[in-house]
Amino acid sequence: MPRSTLPAANSGLSPSRLKSRLPLSVLASLLASTMASGISPALAAPDAVPLLTAQCVEYSSNFQPEFQDLQLLERQTLGLHNINDRLGYYRSFPLSAAQHELLLQCQLKLADTMDRFLSEPALISLTSELNQDDEPQLQALAQRLDWLMQQHLGIEEKARLHGAQASIRQGMRSDDLKLELGQCALPGMQQALNPEENSAEQEAAQSSQKPGFFAVNIASYLMQQADSDCRAKVWRTYQGRARLRNQLPLSSVFALRQQQAKAHGYPSYSDFILSSQLLSTPSDVARFLDASTQKLDYAPWDLGPELQQAQSTEMVALKGSEVLKALFDHLKPLGLTAEQINDDWLRVYHHGRLLGELLISEGKHNRHKMLRRAVVGQQTGQSELVLKPQQVKLKDYQTAVSSLSAAIAQLSGGGRYYLNNSLELPQDGAGVGKAWLERYLSDAFAFSLKPAPGSREQLAEEYQQQLKVFRAKVALASFEAFGNSQYPQLHKAFEASFNGSWPEVSDYSYSFGAISDQGPLYYLGLWQQQLAKAIDVHTRGCNPAQLFDLLLVNESAQPMVARLQSLFGAADAATLIRRIRDANTQENRSTDTCPLPGSDEQYPGRQEPAQR
């Protein structure tokens, strides 16, 4: 089978390619020009939706994959990926019902097209040949295509799964979910509360779903109710609020996932989905979760009074533009620089190579939105960074750091194929580079971005950590084979993290939305943050530019296991869990050594800001 030569890193778009992808270029130019003219992307997005959806239908309908020419195939699929990314971007804006319907039709069209692509017999032959190639970029691409085919569900199964997941989400946000408070009622609880107030308390008390009217009221109730027994009763009832609604759709999700696992020869979906991870068995995940378990001296329903007694972490208030400047100054040692086109538009370079554009806008919350993913030799990236005008609270700084880290991670990938940059395998290795960059950028200020000891923020972080640990245990157990669970008694898992009992703990899976979407992989966020911390602590003597190239750029397309081996010497589950344990006890120790070959012996080591 003929295979085209990889394009040079600085190659541009040929006229024919530019013509075939002109609508996406028009869309990108539209967004860039709106930023240059001071027009908010939120105002421009609705006008671009019809253009995008028209292109979506046309492109998907005419999609005929050319498996005999890899470079042509990459350009064809790149068009689909770009449309899908732009679709996700526009869905983040307030749109009319008609515009949402247009985007939904586009999403369905893209899903059907990708289903046809992954079902093509020629794709199996292509990945087989790529797996035998000596080029690491091609091997990485083959690995990702193989994984997508393995995870692929038929149209009917996918429709049933997505329908059940949608029913679960709807079941938890229905307006007619009510609690009978009885003697535990408080006056005025029927009135809506301001979601902007008591944000730390609300986030700590709410479930994983976005706060709605009822969730805000529950958070406020727990803050105001002085009777601990009433708090416990209402909290437990709230956690089981959607049991009747979600029992059937969640059972459908379990059955579909079990069927998928059996089709691949695994006894449970937990065994199947974990088989390709760094933590490759349910027992590996359980060991990590047990190592991350730390019993708090209060119950979840008693968090409110604990927060009320604590003080907030004091921070220095800075403008969003000042925070952005400080962060980009801290990126310079990594080889990253920014060319300012105007106040709202930056071009980002890495050692002189253009990575893409960063559009800056103001909003109520710090966040990152991806418009177009960077692919070396194919296209530069484009992201929008939304920043609050004033960064006042600790959370403001933390989310600003996280948002810029996400933007830089999206722009800096060194893959020459879209999937090599967008799909990190194994999945529990994905996000580790971004999490490391967050830790690095947290040192950009003269003050610490860690909560003060005993502060509200520290209490909330500790609570959220243990809540995630408990949820991960519930998710893991829910998808394991009957009689072979790592956590057969979930009430004991709850009591290991919290100072309280919960007899109806089995109700939790019905009001825990992420269980149907992420399943046994719910532990990923915890794991990635902890692994990034272990890398950070272990490599404080390394030049951070080396770590940035290794963890985020990865132009040589090294598998994550090989990169972790270069850092830790081994990358088996037991070694990584031990490194995480060590990092938790050695976090504030400095080191002047670096495990990476060819490291800069003159590098003095990275120092953290002074602790509070």
Descriptions of predicted regions:
Residues A166-G304:
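Structured, charged N-terminal subsegments at the starts of enzyme catalytic cores
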